[in-house]
């Protein structure tokens, strides 16, 4: 099933944007792990719509109701299931979409895949709304990892060409990660964040949208976790990252810049530091070699396309009658999904790392 990620951690998301609820089931979560529900709510609140000009005006509390797998503040080891109610749907905004394909959306391809029976309201199962259960699962995984000293953080690296400072690929600390995490608009340099907000608001006023890039870092990941070929760390992270709607690109470490380098420029030279650990002088490899963690920070950048729902007239087709039409999308939509996607990227990386950590000796 395409909505199930089944590895050491089993992870299934279900529901549609305008159905009664969405949810998640996690299998093989270690028993006896203390989970702080307030921290889960805080994590999910970072993904929820903000009451400002940078996000949709759809208002969802995103309060998960845990149905199983959690008792007396701890995981039980049985399937961990959470439901999240949908409470603010405007389904009438989508009344004509059973036959008109929104450019940039999965309406047309979804109709082909599911023979026209797919729920198109709000994007249905393809909606960014499904990142709420992803964030629940990622918040659980993140708490388990942080108890082992592993911290994952992300920030908005770029919005429509306006760039933030990058994480230090060698010396980023958990305090630096927490500082960015606590910001309403998560950039390292606040001045750049303010410029990004202006750019998003400009797109909104122009009845348009913009995309951007999120940078993510994971620190204190033990050297040696992961696998070669098909089950590598990059593979697992990539599968989950591309489960986030609107993601169109992913790079690790120096990424596509390595194509412009020589071997002597790209290679990260090893040495033994003052703590007796094998480390590298640089981190072009992004903390992963051969699908296996090197012990250096894992770094990645994720590209998000502009929100496809824009209020401008666009050419499309009525695929029930096979004729050309013009569509002006109605509804409440983000002029830029990137700010709300920051915890989604963290969640995906948390789940992937926990999945591989379960193979680690003395977990």
Features from the language model and the residues they span:
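Glycine-rich, N-terminal phosphate-binding loop and its surrounding beta-alpha-beta segment
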Residues: 44-103, 107-109
